């Protein structure tokens, strides 16, 4: 078959497919504009946005945030919700754990009056609600907190102690098969928070695994492994926050295995001033000599905690340094990358103030 005949045969096949399955069921990838631009939602931590390679979490995709207890999973997801709202979007929170604190969410920046929340009775209801919200096309981000709390209906109806093998894994697999296509069409970002468990009898390798089976690992475009690596001390030597390390364990949209570190403060959430300070030092915008920090040959102060508070107070200085960081990023076109091993939970260490 020569080239003109092949083109005619292809055009006839495409016409028949569109007639059979509807317009847009098959198209040229290059002409499909949605493939060229990926809409994202910022995470609240600039260092993590850079590690993701696309300056945020993508819309229309499944995201998994997993880690041990008190590692900042819910805080990170809540910041994504707050940033989606700041962009004019609508957010929904499926609180399967029944543990969302409205006052803390409001402190982070969430407009709780506009936040849609659901506290379903069982896992099937939670995932059905998520699918219906995504299908509406009116929701920008849906947070499911958490996968471990999505209890199958048959398990709820049984007695404590009954053995239910693979129920949750089958439920997640069935739901994600339906949900992923809906999310892509509606450009809704689904953020699944997950817990970790220990595999029994593992002598070599990492014994940690996540709940809900393998389906979520496969369907996730991005998986974030979040760990607490130290505590942050205030001027009176009391704990005021945690130092957090996030490894991009999977990334379908940029190179994976990048690592980002940032501060989560108890009364603030993710510290944007701390992120700016760390990146400014990394890009030599702020010079660090011992415990002193200098900017344009002027002393900003002594101690990381003092300088972070100074950047938080002085909004003009904060924005000036932030602009210079973005200029460096644009010039280099390479995000901050730290190749490292999988972050493991380590004994708490003190971050020097």
From Swiss-Prot:
Superkingdom of this protein's organism: Bacteria
PROSITE patterns per record: RECA_1 (PS00321), RECA_2 (PS50162), RECA_3 (PS50163)
SMART domains referenced in this protein's UniProt entry, alphabetically: AAA (SM00382)
Chief location of this protein within or outside the cell: cytoplasm
Entries under InterPro entries matching the protein: AAA+_ATPase, DNA_recomb/repair_RecA, DNA_recomb/repair_RecA_CS, P-loop_NTPase, RecA-like_C, RecA-like_N, RecA_ATP-bd, RecA_C_sf
Keywords: ATP-binding, Cytoplasm, DNA damage, DNA recombination, DNA repair, DNA-binding, Nucleotide-binding, SOS response
One GO BP: SOS response
Keyword Cytoplasm carried by entry: yes
Binding site for ATP: 67-74
Subcellular location, record wording: Cytoplasm
Gene3D superfamilies, per the entry: P-loop containing nucleotide triphosphate hydrolases (3.40.50.300)
Molecular function (Gene Ontology), one example: ATP binding
Record-level GO cellular component terms: cytosol
DNA damage is among the record's keywords: yes
NCBIfam families associated with the record: tigrfam_recA
Function: Can catalyze the hydrolysis of ATP in the presence of single-stranded DNA, the ATP-dependent uptake of single-stranded DNA by duplex DNA, and the ATP-dependent hybridization of homologous single-stranded DNAs. It interacts with LexA causing its activation and leading to its autocatalytic cleavage.
Family in the record: Belongs to the RecA family.
HAMAP family cross-referenced by the UniProt entry: RecA
Protein known as: Protein RecA
Lineage of producing organism: Bacteria, Pseudomonadati, Chlamydiota, Chlamydiia, Chlamydiales
């Amino acid at each position: 078959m020569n080239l003109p005949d092949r083109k005619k045969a292809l055009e006839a096949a495409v016409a028949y497919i569109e007639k059979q399955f509807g317009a847009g069921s098959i198209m040229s990838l290059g002409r499909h504009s949605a493939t060229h631009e990926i809409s994202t939602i910022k995470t609240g931590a600039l260092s993590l946005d850079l590690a993701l390679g696309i300056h945020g979490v993508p819309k229309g995709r499944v995201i998994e945030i997993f880690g041990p207890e008190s590692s900042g999973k819910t805080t990170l997801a809540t910041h994504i919700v707050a940033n989606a709202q700041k962009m004019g979007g609508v957010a929904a929170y499926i609180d399967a754990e029944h543990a969302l604190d409205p006052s803390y969410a409001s402190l982070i920046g969430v407009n709780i009056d506009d936040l849609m929340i659901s506290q379903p009775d069982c896992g099937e209801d939670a995932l059905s609600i998520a699918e219906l919200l995504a299908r509406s096309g009116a929701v920008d981000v849906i947070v499911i907190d958490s996968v471990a709390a999505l209890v199958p209906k048959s398990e709820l109806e049984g007695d404590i102690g009954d053995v239910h093998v693979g129920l949750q894994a089958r439920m997640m697999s069935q739901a994600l098969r339906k949900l992923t296509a809906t999310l892509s069409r509606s450009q809704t970002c689904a953020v699944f928070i997950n817990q970790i468990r220990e595999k029994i009898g593992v002598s070599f390798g990492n014994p940690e695994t996540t709940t809900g089976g393998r389906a979520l690992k496969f369907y996730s475009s991005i998986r974030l492994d979040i760990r607490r690596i130290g505590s942050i001390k205030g001027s009176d030597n009391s704990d005021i926050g945690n130092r957090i390390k996030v490894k991009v364990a999977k990334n379908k949209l940029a190179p994976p295995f990048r690592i980002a570190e940032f501060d989560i403060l108890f009364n603030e959430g993710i510290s944007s001033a701390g992120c700016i300070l760390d990146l400014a030092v990394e890009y030599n915008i702020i010079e660090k000599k011992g415990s002193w920090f200098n900017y344009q040959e002027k002393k900003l102060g002594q101690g990381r905690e003092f300088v972070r508070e100074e950047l938080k107070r002085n909004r003009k200085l904060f924005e000036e340094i932030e602009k210079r960081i973005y200029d460096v990023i644009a010039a280099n076109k390479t995000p901050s990358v730290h190749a490292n091993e999988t972050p493991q939970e380590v004994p708490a260490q003190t971050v020097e103030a």
